[in-house]
C-alpha cells in the first residue's frame, strides 16, 4: 500500500538497523516494479543481517524504509563530531561517499577533509566554503555550492542543539538533476544529555538495543556487552578499562564493560550479578573494586549479601584495594562463599583466567 504513495520509477526498500554495511548484507533492495515492493518487504522483515558492525550474531530487521530511487551523479561523505585533540566540533568530508569512512582514512587518507569549528564563534560561511572547495564542488557542480554550505550550517545546528555525538550523511549525493540529497543519515546522541530532549527519547527503538544494556540502564549501571567469557564488575570507568586490558594480557577476553559507580551497594552488586549471569557466554566473574570514598569493608558486605541473594553458578574472583581493603578481604574470606580473594590486579586476573580457561 505504501508503494502507491510514491510516484517514482525506482523503489528502494531499506532495512532499518543500527549498523552500517546493510547494502552488502542484502538489507537494501531496489526494484522498478511497484508490485514487487510488498514481496521485498516481506523478505526483509524478520531477517537477520550480519554486517561488519553487527558482530557474528547480526541484527534482526523490525523496521523498513521505502523511498524513491535517486538519479545519482556523484556520492560524497559528510559528518560532524567532536575532535578529540582540540575538543571542538569538526566536519569530516570526502569525495569517497558510499564507502566506510574508516576504510577511506586507512587506504587513502589524503581524501579526508577536516574543518574545525570554533564553538565560541559557531559555524561560519567560510567554513562551508573551505569544505566545498576542498571537495571540488566548484568544478564538479557549482549549482550545489550554496545548498551544500547551507546544509553544513543545518548539521552544525542539529549537532549543537540536540547534544549529538555524531551526525553523519553517507552518501550525500549530487543528482544528475543538479540537486543535493542526503541519501542516508545517522545521528548518535550523547546519553548524558538525553534527559534534555524528550523528542529524541521518543524515537528510541528498544528492538535495536541489547536487552541487558536496557536492564542495566534501569538499575543505573553502565553496561556494554562484549564477546568474551569473563564477566567484569568494576567501580569507575577508568578502572573498568584497565580491568579489561589486564584480562586480555592474561590470555582471555572480557564479556562486558560494567561500571557499578561509586556506591557498589548490595542492590547495585546484586543487579550486576543478575545481568552478568544472564549472558550465556559468561564462564566466570571478576569483581575489581577500589575503595576510595566508599570503604572496602562496606563493599565486601554488599558483595556477600548480593552473592547470597543471587545464585552464582560460575567461578568468582574479588579484588579489593583501597580504604580498609584488608578488612574487606578478611570478611570475604570468612564469608563461607565459594570465591577467591585477591589484592593484586595481575594476580586476580590470572586467577579468573585460570578458573575459566584461556580464550580460544
Question: What is the role of each PLM region?
Answer:
Residues 1-169, 173-287, 297-299, 308, ...:
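ATP-dependent carboxylate/acyl-activation modules
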Residues 304-305:
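Short amphipathic alpha-helix used as the core "switch/output" element in two-component signaling
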Residues 292:
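Catalytic core of bacterial c-di-GMP phosphodiesterases, primarily the EAL and HD-GYP domains
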Residues 313-322:
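Short internal beta-strands
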